[in-house]
């Protein structure tokens, strides 16, 4: 195969990887919930999974209540929801 053909194949495989959604059958349902700061007035850095962007993002957590889409570290969020 020529080098041009290899680059074309690599480009197509990369495009397929980007456009093909990750299977969400094993992802917990709470990963689909919106970020919820809760009712307390604290200001704590937290992370939530954003299902449209398929990544974990930062938000400010108040310190109580909220929902389960709330992680102390981005790594914990990625392990739970983005894997």
Curated annotation (Swiss-Prot):
Cystine bridges: which residues? 31-81, 40-64, 56-77
Matching Pfam families? Kunitz_BPTI (PF00014)
| Gene3D superfamilies assigned to the protein according to its UniProt record, in alphabetical order | Pancreatic trypsin inhibitor Kunitz domain (4.10.410.10)
Record's signal peptide: 1-24
So which tissues is this one expressed in?
A: Expressed by the venom gland.
Which Gene Ontology MF annotations are present? Answer: serine-type endopeptidase inhibitor activity; toxin activity
Q: Which Gene Ontology cellular-component terms appear in the entry?
A: extracellular region
Which residues does the UniProt record annotate as the domain BPTI/Kunitz inhibitor?
31-81
Q: Where is this site: Reactive bond for trypsin?
A: 41-42
**Key words of the record:** Disulfide bond, Protease inhibitor, Secreted, Serine protease inhibitor, Signal, Toxin
- Where is this protein found? Secreted
What is the purpose of this protein? Serine protease inhibitor.
**Other comments on record:** Negative results: does not inhibit voltage-gated potassium channels (Kv).
UniProt family annotation: Belongs to the venom Kunitz-type family.
This one is known as Kunitz-type serine protease inhibitor mulgin-2
Cite the source lineage: Eukaryota, Metazoa, Chordata, Craniata, Vertebrata
């Amino acid at each position: 195969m020529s080098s041009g053909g290899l680059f074309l194949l690599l480009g197509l495989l990369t495009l397929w990887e980007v456009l093909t959604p990750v299977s969400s059958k094993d992802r917990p349902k709470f990963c689909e919930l919106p970020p919820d700061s809760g009712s307390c007035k604290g200001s704590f850095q937290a992370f939530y999974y954003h299902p449209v962007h398929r990544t974990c993002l930062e938000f400010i957590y108040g310190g109580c209540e909220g929902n389960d889409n709330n992680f102390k570290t981005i790594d914990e969020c990625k392990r739970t929801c983005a894997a």
